[in-house]
Every structure is written in structure tokens, then in C-alpha cells.
């Protein structure tokens, strides 16, 4: 599909053919869709529809498939599980121009799904990577909707401190690699050696380079200087997060150089993190691949029994 949106009449969109998603291992969940200003956003709503939602947010350059080993135990435990494919990823539409991807626009897209369309409350959020850069903005904007939060290998940068050499190296690679091989990137940043069919599932949303504008753009949207457009709104978000006193847990991995130490910063600044059983699990950046069942257990233990 190539279309134009009401939000921006010059926004060209691609939609990954559905047959790219057929027969993926361990992914039986049918998608639901909401269209926001002409952009179709996919999400997966499974489990007990009467229960409060566990919201799972992926990051760069993955899609909700990242949670395939986390979702089944949550369903068995009686929870409702909602995973959202960010715009540019998974089954969601993919603007072809990198300029159409902005930090603020991603926040608004996510807000449209979580708040305006699904109207979720009493949310338990698990956010990873860019899922945190966006999800924590929603927590700041709507703290009353979020009952508890788990942040995993993520942060909310304001551009006033260096992100570190490992992130800058990744940022440079993402801009200069002639072929951004998504599945191999996930494999290389996991301790687990992923089999070919799992690598292929991460490649599925991206038939060719035209579909990868979002994956290319996300790294340069991370604010690394104080004059970045996202610096001020993220700083304002921290004012709200500094008052968030509901349970806030960090679950980071022991082998992710990109986000190492960010868990300490989150725990220092967010009051809800006090006296929580923070965890460090064995894993690379994509800890869902290395410790998926452990993450599910942590989530189940974190949510009070009804």
C-alpha cells in the first residue's frame, strides 16, 4: 500500500504484505488495527479481556514478536496482554520518508492507541529500548492510568549527558550500513544464538530497504545534545516522573553495554522504585530472547493477585 495521510498530505506509506507474517514460529496472535490520521497501527490483544492490561512495548528495530516467550505465561496466569507494533515496525504502516518519523509524532501515535482508542487504565507496562523512550512519556502524561511500570534496558534521555560510546557506535552503524539486516542485529545483540527461522521472523516486516526508514531513523531521534527537539519535552516528562510513586521496577541485563547504568539512574530519580525487587538478568540487549520466561515470571510476581 502506498497512501497519503490526513496528518501530512505528503506522507507516503508502505504496508508489509500479510503473507510475510504467515507461519511464524510461536506467534499465533491475530492483529487488531487502529487508524490514526491515515496511519494504520497494529496491536495484539489477547488473554483475559476482563483483566487489567499488561502493556508490552518493543523498541528498535524489533516488533511485538520480541515478546513471544513472555506472552504465554501471562495468559496462563489470567492476564490480558496487549502488545503494540510501533509505526515503522511489525504490521504497522511504514512511512517511507525518514523525515516523517519524529520523537513527538511517535509519542502521539502511541498515545492514540493506548489512551484514545483502547482507553486503558490500571496498566502494567513493560517497556524495552524505544518502548521506554515512548512509554515513559505516556506515564509522565497520564500517571493515573499506569498502576505499575517495569523498565528494561531503556532510559529517557534529555541530551544533557553523553549516551556513551557504545550507543554512538550503534548510531553510526545504523546510518552507514549498506544493508541493515534486522534479524542479524537482534541475533548479535542477544546472548542466545537465534535459529534461522527466528531471525527470519524479525526480518519479516521489512521486505526491502524501502521499509526500513523507521529502523534507520530511530537511532538519530535519541536526544544526545540539549538543543535536540526532544530534549525539552523529555525534561518536562522527568518533572512528572519524579513524582511517580507507584511501583516502578528495573529489569536490566548484565551484557548490554548500550544501556548499562541507566537502571541506577531510573531508580535514583523515580520514587516508586524504592524498596522494589530490582533485577539484573543474564542477557544481551534483547533480554526477551535470553530470559523470556524469567521476564514473564517477574511480571506475574509484580502484579498483585486479584
Name every feature range the model reports, one short phrase each:
Residues 1-10:
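Short, Lys/Arg-enriched N-terminal segments with co-localized hydrophobic residues
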Residues 11-30, 41, 46-47, 53, ...:
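Flexible "cap/lid" subdomain of the alpha/beta-hydrolase fold that forms the substrate-access gate
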Residues 56-59, 83:
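Structural cue for short, hydrophobic secondary-structure segments
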Residues 59-62, 129:
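Active-site glycine-rich loops that stabilize anionic/oxyanionic intermediates
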Residues 65-82:
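Short amphipathic alpha-helix adjacent to the substrate-entry channel of hydrolases
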Residues 69-70, 265, 294:
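A short acidic, amphipathic alpha-helical/loop segment
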Residues 283-296:
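Catalytic histidine-centered segment of alpha/beta-hydrolase-like enzymes
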Amino acid at each position: 500500500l502506498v497512501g497519503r495521510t490526513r496528518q501530512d498530505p505528503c506522507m507516503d506509506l508502505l504496508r508489509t504484505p500479510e503473507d510475510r507474517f504467515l507461519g511464524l514460529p510461536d506467534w499465533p496472535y491475530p492483529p487488531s488495527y487502529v487508524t490514526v490520521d491515515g496511519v494504520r497501527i497494529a496491536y495484539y490483544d489477547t488473554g483475559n479481556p476482563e483483566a487489567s492490561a499488561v502493556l508490552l512495548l518493543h523498541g528498535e528495530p524489533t516488533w511485538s514478536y520480541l515478546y513471544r516467550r513472555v506472552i504465554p505465561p501471562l495468559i496462563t496466569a489470567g492476564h490480558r496482554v496487549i502488545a503494540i507494533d510501533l509505526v515503522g515496525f511489525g504490521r504497522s504502516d511504514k512511512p517511507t520518508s525518514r523525515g516523517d518519523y519524529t520523537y513527538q509524532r511517535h509519542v502521539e501515535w502511541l498515545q492514540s492507541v493506548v489512551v484514545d482508542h483502547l482507553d486503558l487504565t490500571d496498566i502494567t507496562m513493560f517497556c524495552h529500548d524505544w518502548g521506554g523512550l515512548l512509554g515513559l512519556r505516556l506515564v509522565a502524561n497520564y500517571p493515573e492510568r499506569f498502576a505499575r511500570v517495569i523498565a528494561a534496558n531503556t532510559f529517557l534521555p534529555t541530551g544533557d549527558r553523553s549516551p556513551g560510546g557504545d550507543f554512538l557506535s550503534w548510531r553510526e552503524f545504523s546510518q552507514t550500513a549498506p544493508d541493515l539486516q534486522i534479524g542479524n542485529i537482534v541475533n548479535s545483540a542477544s546472548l542466545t544464538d537465534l535459529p534461522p527461522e527466528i531471525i527470519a521472523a524479525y526480518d519479516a516486516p521489512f521486505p526491502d530497504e524501502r521499509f526500513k526508514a523507521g529502523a534507520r531513523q530511530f537511532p538519530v531521534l535519541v536526544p544526545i545534545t540539549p538543543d535536540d527537539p526532544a530534549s525539552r519535552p523529555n525534561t518536562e516528562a522527568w518533572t512528572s516522573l519524579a513524582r511517580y510513586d507507584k511501583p516502578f521496577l528495573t529489569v536490566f541485563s548484565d551484557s548490554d553495554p548500550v544501556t548499562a547504568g541507566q537502571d541506577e539512574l531510573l531508580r535514583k530519580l523515580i520514587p516508586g522504585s524504592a524498596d522494589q525487587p530490582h533485577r539484573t538478568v543474564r542477557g544481551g540487549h534483547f533480554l526477551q530472547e535470553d530470559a523470556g520466561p524469567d521476564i514473564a515470571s517477574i511480571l506475574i510476581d509484580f502484579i498483585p493477585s486479584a
